[in-house]
Amino acid sequence: MSTAYSLSKPLERRRSIAVTIGDVVVGGHSPIVVQSMTNTDTADVDATVAQIAALWQVGSQLVRITVDRDEAAAAVPKIRERLERLGFIVPLVGDFHYIGHKLLSEHPACAEALAKYRINPGNVGFGAKKDRQFAEIIEIACRYRKPIRIGVNWGSLDNVLLTRLMDENAQQAKPLSVAEVMRETVVQSALHSAVWAEEIGLGRDQIILSAKVSDVQDLIAVYSTLAERCDYALHLGLTEAGMGTKGVVASSVALGILLQQGIGDTIRISLTPEPGGDRTREVKVAQELLQVMGFRQFFPVVAACPGCGRTTSKVFQQLAQKIEADLYKNMAVWREKYPGVESLKVAVMGCIVNGPGESKHADIGISLPGIGESPAAPVFIEGQKVKILRGNHIAEEFESLLSHYIHTRFGQD
């Protein structure tokens, strides 16, 4: 039995209503779902299918696509059909703004092909048309038995609601700050829309809410309030998180705090990709976040020290990098061949200070020699030292031991 362990207690999640989207369940007692969104022109069937397939293959359980005009709506059933022919059964979420009622009404094949609709109360319609157009979308969802995400975004808030709350706040003896009124508007917009959708006929088990803002502290405040006031399933995401490290850090901090409080049933890490960048990165970051917090296990963990003046070379860094890359590359096949392999923990350490201890805590680990240490690398499996490697082929020998361990422990034959 493995000796790899965590000292933390299991995290308790907020109770929410389960919503079924295709073959994926969001909320209830289901694991937190990772989702993503394409950035292709949906009318370009080839490009959109290719990107959806790439996102699904790295682990996106739901994929959202823009449906912004007739050509995009007409392409949706073709996209779904093409994906199914390729063997990719991916629940597709249609992202609608401004004319969703028109597109869903005039393109019934699109309405049927999608697994879920996303609408924004702030731009579903304006003035006298808003109520009618919102109701039309909900009625279509009821007709086709599709769940809906009511996705509020503070960049496109319902101005009528915002103005009313601002006016009411101004009459108070101790008025709230503008930021507090903005946050309350986001929450009320989501909740009022959900209640209204129910009154039209949509079931509580067909509603997911999101309330996205671009500031970390505001996001935490908004979702904390939303979670207190309802039991709808919640979609977490920091909108306009940005590019590169900043985007990853901002999203991880905001979502991590909420997840630690038990809030959140599905997440998306919204990263602005660099020109020519890999769209799948947002999926990998979401998976890493859920894994390091102990909510999900997607792939083996490789623990490696950062290196310091005690380490003699970059060998342990190169070995750790290669092992992690090989494990990740093989996971698509290994999940079937070696059930449970995603729980594996490997340690690749660079000196005697923490090397042996960390290696003992892993399923399998190696402690490479540092400055002044004997040129030997002990290997530990499930807490026991099983071998000492020496010479110029330590990396290759450890990789061989790792492969044998995976086959022995997780193989079915």
From Swiss-Prot:
Superkingdom of origin: Bacteria
Record note on cofactor: Binds 1 [4Fe-4S] cluster.
Keyword Membrane: no
Pfam families cross-referenced by the UniProt entry: GcpE (PF04551)
Needed co-factor(s): [4Fe-4S] cluster
Catalytic activity: (2E)-4-hydroxy-3-methylbut-2-enyl diphosphate + oxidized [flavodoxin] + H2O + 2 H(+) = 2-C-methyl-D-erythritol 2,4-cyclic diphosphate + reduced [flavodoxin]
InterPro entries in alphabetical order: Dihydropteroate_synth-like_sf, IspG_bac, IspG_bac-typ, NO2/SO3_Rdtase_4Fe4S_sf
SUPFAM superfamilies: Nitrite and sulphite reductase 4Fe-4S domain-like
GO molecular function, one term: 4 iron, 4 sulfur cluster binding
Pathway: Isoprenoid biosynthesis; isopentenyl diphosphate biosynthesis via DXP pathway; isopentenyl diphosphate from 1-deoxy-D-xylulose 5-phosphate: step 5/6
Gene Ontology biological process terms, A to Z: isopentenyl diphosphate biosynthetic process, methylerythritol 4-phosphate pathway; terpenoid biosynthetic process
Keywords: 4Fe-4S, Iron, Iron-sulfur, Isoprene biosynthesis, Metal-binding, Oxidoreductase
Residue positions binding [4Fe-4S] cluster: C305, C308, C351, E358
EC number: 1.17.7.3
Its job: Converts 2C-methyl-D-erythritol 2,4-cyclodiphosphate (ME-2,4cPP) into 1-hydroxy-2-methyl-2-(E)-butenyl 4-diphosphate.
Family named by the database record: Belongs to the IspG family.
Protein name: 4-hydroxy-3-methylbut-2-en-1-yl diphosphate synthase (flavodoxin)
Source organism of the structure: Bartonella quintana (strain Toulouse)
